[in-house]
């Protein structure tokens, strides 16, 4: 009897301890302004106005996803601005935007009353504002993710869904020489780009789709082959030179371009890297340029067909869409056909990285094709 009493007493004590440690449940709350900081400068929310660079194009699409009712499978937006979860209440071109919650949104009103977006903030200032509690959500460069986490910040990292690639410009020598294209492709040390430039926050890319999406990325080599690159380049007469363009406003592209130049020159390739003020076009001297391609869908067929549409004739004569029920083998064969031309040279896959403030609740890292998850985020009044 005493043993039963002792066991009961012990059980009761454990229950009381557990109850004392239990935290009160947190329920979603409406209200507040979500403070967001980004590096891009968006001059106009109008989708008809072209973006000056890839960073502005991405931010513009993210904002549009909050303003329109929904996004179609092909990535276009449906409805009119303001039919989505938010509407524009203030817009200072290139500096600041305030989006107010749409009370009549068919998907339900967002939890926050508004989203304030500060544009053109430097990477350093974004991290500092997160630490000081002046920002709730801020973009973090992939190469800064590990350092931010070590400093105790909440860091959200998505699946790698943005491809950084070298794209050869049609009609410009030596881009029209297949040996030159292959030589450059084989000279690049992708692992070094991931390990040293990206600080291991990314993946080497040999194909146009990531492993988590297609399941066949491992079939594409990502290893450098400097001897083969040197042999290919030696076959080309006339000592051609490749000019590799990159976005002048993108420090990551600059670092990658400079690394490619080092690798290529070690293989005897004549190459130089030059900054372009307008990433939307390539100067006549550029034979190749760095390009960012973001997946519009986690599904391999949809993502690959979007890349084909964006790249156009660069990928080759066959730009016809794959059937909706295309088998994995068919998707792989089309991908292999494009990569084997060396007109598009995949380099690395990049994730979306965000730093989160203490007030932010219910954040979910966006999947490929998804926009900023501000509709479902709510703010804790007194975070612990």
What are these regions (language model features)?
Residues 35-38, 85, 113-114, 132, ...:
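Alpha-helical secondary-structure segments
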Residues 37-83:
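N-terminal lobe/hinge region of extracytoplasmic solute-binding protein
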Residues 63-110, 114, 124, 227, ...:
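Gly/Pro-rich hinge or "lid" segments in bacterial periplasmic/extracellular proteins
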Residues 93, 234-296:
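Ligand/substrate-recognition segments at binding pockets and active sites
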Residues 104-147:
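Ligand-site clamp/hinge motif
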Residues 199, 203-235, 248-255:
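Structural transition elements
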Residues 278-326:
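Acidic-aromatic pocket-rim loops
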Residues 356-384:
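Long beta-strand-rich cores associated with HINT superfamily self-processing modules
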